[in-house]
Amino acid sequence: MENTEKKQPLVQVKNLCKYFEISRKETLKAVDDLTFDIYKGETVSLVGESGCGKSTTGRTMIKLYNPTSGNVYYDGKDIFKYNHAEQKEFCKKVQMIFQNPYSSLNPRMTVKDIVGEGLKQHGMSTKDADAKVEQLLATVGLN
């Protein structure tokens, strides 16, 4: 028997454009007519060459930039039409991990050290952080 229920996307990006005015005569089309869906439970990677618009797409998707045109829907609602309360709730649910090529990975640190660092910064003891990291690494098959 076929499942006829249509799955609704959690995130929909529709015809997203973000242009930057470089001068009165020149416009940089950082993102030009991008459309895609993300469904609950999916892991999505946006990959491409340096300068192709990956970070601009992410920044626009979480409202750090206003789009030139297009829409971003989260759970069926246009994020650019959120009221104050909806915006606060949205900020609790989404985040962007900014890329920094100069601090990406420290070759002197193990995966355990890197993952545990954030836990310790939030007040977790070294013993508890180590145990949590071991559990997480085992969960994803990196033990």
Which residues does each predicted region cover?
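ABC transporter nucleotide-binding domains
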Residues: M1-N143
